[in-house]
């Protein structure tokens, strides 16, 4: 049986070259609140205990989908106050992908941020593929398992994804010295159509496989896994059951929508 102690989790994480860290300080390590120092305590904890790994933090901002502009330097992070604190005060790098970008304390040494005018945030040029190809861990530092964006990378690797469709969002990327026109292309779920992931099953399945490492005490919930091991397990599960990620009601909805002539959902069916 896996050891679910705090030290065992940190030891597991420290084995990895890269760690992608989702954060929610309401369920992270329980530090005493001190105004002006609280967020720094969390960053210091991560930096000290994972000092031999490269730490990446999601810096997602969804405004590009509405206003067609991604400003690399100025767009705030919409997925965690700790992440935004790091961006404003300590980050030295932010990736150029609209919506699904990330920050790091130092510029990555071997990840190449080379977006073209046509961007798929989950393809083989993405940070998620880099994590898959390198020795990387995915760490939920208090964040809910349902924030595992890696699931969309797995879906993008499937050639027969039948419950989402590809949509293109045109816009511009702005930085201090440049502006470029781009098209963001990725799979989206249908509007006004019930479709939800079965996160409880997804999490419990990788736990039963011995792939999930966690520490839970009081309100603290820390969870981690090796990216490649979990991606490979999910790909195998999808090859057996293409609707594996979905809950029961969603699977029924999708199966009722498609037919012999229409073997997957299309944008024209909903927009």
Regions found by a protein language model. Name each.
Residues 1-271:
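N-terminal and secondary-structure boundary signal
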